[in-house]
């Protein structure tokens, strides 16, 4: 099974599927925001950033998926983005399903000074809603934050298998 992950990770199709899946989720979020007028909360913005991180990882690997260093760099970006997305979706799920005064969102989106996405692209990366449990949205009996938790968990599991397959192949050659 690890060999299959290793072989697929060296193909452009693998990375194109990763890019398409993350862009699909970003598109759904933007559709909800602009067409259905559902304003994103701060945790939604952070999850959106994690999806952009996964997309960037896929784009980097798409340049040359057979180059080991580039592929490993992309997998680590993917892994980090999936972990951060899982973290934010878990917090979002907890605040949505179990609202309390101890679980609250930040008042403002905070990005590093060297990457102020909320100032560069406020229409995508800024939120006017600081209350993360004010608008729970359901799809097929699950709240959106639960779906995002599931998606980030799938991204994380696939990224872990992919990085293990890379390490397995590197050590097997020696």
Curated annotation (Swiss-Prot):
InterPro entries per record: DiS_bond_form_DsbB/BdbC (IPR003752), Disulphide_bond_form_DsbB (IPR022920), DsbB (IPR050183), DsbB-like_sf (IPR023380)
General function of this protein: Required for disulfide bond formation in some periplasmic proteins. Acts by oxidizing the DsbA protein.
Cited PANTHER family: DISULFIDE BOND FORMATION PROTEIN B
Keywords: Cell inner membrane, Cell membrane, Chaperone, Disulfide bond, Electron transport, Membrane, Oxidoreductase, Redox-active center, Transmembrane, Transmembrane helix, Transport
HAMAP family noted in UniProt: DsbB
Cytoplasmic side: 1-14, 66-72, 166-174
Disulfide-bond pairs as recorded: 41-44, 105-132
Gene behind this protein: dsbB
Listed transmembrane segments: 15-31, 50-65, 73-90, 147-165
Protein name, as recorded: Disulfide bond formation protein B
């Amino acid at each position: 099974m690890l060999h299959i992950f290793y072989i697929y990770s060296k193909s452009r199709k693998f990375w194109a599927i990763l890019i398409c899946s993350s862009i699909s989720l970003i598109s759904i979020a933007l559709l909800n925001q602009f067409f259905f007028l559902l304003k994103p909360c701060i945790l939604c913005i952070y999850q959106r950033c994690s999806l952009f991180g996964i997309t960037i990882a896929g784009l980097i690997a798409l340049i040359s998926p057979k180059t080991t260093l580039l592929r490993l760099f992309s997998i680590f970006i993917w892994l980090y983005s999936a972990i951060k997305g899982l973290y934010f979706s878990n917090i979002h799920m907890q605040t949505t399903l179990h609202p309390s005064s101890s679980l609250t969102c930040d008042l403002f989106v905070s990005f590093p000074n060297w990457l102020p996405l909320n100032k560069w692209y406020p229409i995508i990366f800024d939120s006017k809603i600081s209350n993360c449990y004010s608008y729970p949205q359901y799809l097929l009996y699950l709240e959106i934050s639960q779906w995002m938790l599931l998606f980030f968990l799938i991204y994380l599991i696939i990224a872990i298998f992919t990085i293990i397959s890379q390490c397995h192949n590197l050590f097997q050659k020696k």
